[in-house]
Regions:
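C-terminal membrane-cytosol helix-exit motif in multi-pass small-molecule transporters
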Residues: 164-184, 373-377
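C-terminal transmembrane helical hairpin of 12-TM major facilitator-type secondary transporters
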Residues: 270-312
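Conserved MFS/SLC helix-loop-helix module at the cytosolic interface between two early adjacent transmembrane helices
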Residues: 53-92
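Juxtamembrane intracellular "pre-TM" segments in multi-pass secondary transporters
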Residues: 179-206
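Helix-to-loop junctions at the C-terminal end of transmembrane segments
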Residues: 55-66, 253-267
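Cytoplasmic helix-loop-helix junction between adjacent transmembrane helices
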Residues: 97-138
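Paired small-residue
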Residues: 77-84, 92-101, 295-303
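Helix-breaking motifs and short loop linkers at transmembrane-helix boundaries and internal kinks
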Residues: 34, 66, 87-93, 104, ...
Length: 390
């Protein structure tokens, strides 16, 4: 298990590094490319579009030809794309590099869940995903610091060289240590019909559950600077301190989740996760109704972090359960649903004029409704399937 944890950790870190490492250099990139900061920030959406546009194809290739091809290919693409973006002379070339970075990061993102699902039992999978999530929580805190250190010695292009080096290390370690994990295909396993998953009510319900949880955490990340700095008047330094504390809450919860799983079991941990969301809603509503009470707001933020950190790995493991011969395709579908739902939600509520606090509260309510749908409908679906087979 330690070898697979190392390999998959090096796979999944490319996704957040591709987002967080270059943010401190946005003004310098804008000046160098003679672009507006808004154009540079558009590269974030292009990066996510690159991920979403290719993960289905990557999943099908992995299910048909093996996981190593996708892992090594994704790492190589990320290396080359980072160098393209780092040597850009104009915004178009920068966009091109960011798009292909997204392709490489997306391939390695879905392979993280795929490889772990291949080699671990359902119980150990939830624990492993929680541990990986705990390490990943540190990256948004450390990446700006690392970016600042790079900028203190090199220009902004050095950041993309650093991204390329991280991807090269990831590819090399996986080349040397990662063995092929794709299960042998068996007649009648359904491996040739990956789209059959989309007709599975159980899989789609659990996909909605994971997507609603991802939407909640991404909305929290998106609106927290607006709430704290614009509404409460926090300085950049004060905001950074709060985010470091929240990252610590997320990391601590993620590392404690394996113990909770042994003690309570998966279903109770999932219930604790959504109880945290419910308490977060109450805390945020209290802050909102009192005209902005920071002593209610910050515990609400912490509860959002707790809910996501202890529940996401369990929900992902449940969604991938039973997808043994199409697990890479299933991981790709989950990735697309999570990106699409969160992006659509943030865009739609922004267009409708919702305030940042309202957006976060509604996202948490969506997660709670998804959980209630899963708890109410899955037993009924299992009973219906048992009757049809009997």
């Amino acid at each position: 298990m330690p070898v697979f944890l190392l390999c998959t950790f090096l796979m999944i870190i490319l996704y957040p590094i591709g987002i967080d490492l270059y943010l401190v250099a946005v003004p310098k990139i804008a000046d160098a490319l003679q672009a507006s900061e808004a154009q540079i920030h558009t590269a974030f959406s292009i990066y996510l579009f690159g991920m979403a546009a290719t993960v289905l194809l990557g999943g099908m290739i992995a299910d048909r030809y093996g996981r190593r091809w996708v892992v090594l290919g994704g790492a190589l693409i990320f290396v080359l794309a980072s160098l393209v973006a780092g040597h850009a002379e104009g915004i178009t070339q920068f966009y091109l590099g960011r798009f292909w970075q997204g392709i490489g990061a997306g391939a390695l993102y879905i392979m993280t869940f795929t490889v772990l699902r291949d080699v671990l039992s359902q119980e150990r999978l939830a624990m492993a995903l929680s541990m990986i999530n705990g390490v990943i929580c540190v990256i948004p805190v450390l990446a700006p610091v690392l970016g600042y250190l790079i900028l203190s010695h090199f220009d902004w292009r050095g950041i993309f060289v650093a991204m390329a080096l991280v991807a090269a290390v990831s590819g090399l370690v996986n080349l040397l240590l990662l063995k092929e994990t794709r299960p042998a295909r068996q007649p009648g396993s359904g491996a040739a019909q990956p789209f059959a998953l989309l007709r599975s009510p159980r899989f789609m319900l659990l996909s909605l559950l994971t997507s609603a949880s991802v939407t909640s955490i991404l909305v929290y990340v998106s609106v927290s600077p607006l709430i704290l700095m614009k509404e409460f008047g926090f300085t950049t330094e004060q905001y950074s301190i709060v985010m470091m504390v929240m990252a610590g809450v997320s990391m601590s919860t993620s590392f404690l989740t394996p113990l909770l799983l042994r003690w309570l079991g998966k279903q109770k941990v999932l219930a604790v996760s959504h109880l945290s969301y419910l308490l977060a809603v109450c805390s945020l509503l209290g802050s909102w109704q009192t005209g902005g009470d920071i002593h209610l707001l910050l515990p609400g933020f912490a509860l959002v972090c707790v809910g996501f950190s202890c529940g996401f790995g369990v929900a992902m493991g449940e969604a991938l359960d039973g997808c043994q011969h199409n697990v890479a395709f299933a991981s790709a579908v989950l990735c697309i649903m999570q990106i699409s739902l969160s992006g659509l939600y943030i865009w739609l509520l922004g267009q409708l004029g919702f305030t940042p606090s309202e957006m976060l509260i509604c996202a948490l309510l969506l997660a709670l409704l998804s959980y209630l749908a899963v708890k109410g409908l899955l037993p009924w679906l299992a009973l219906r399937e048992a009757r049809s087979q009997g």
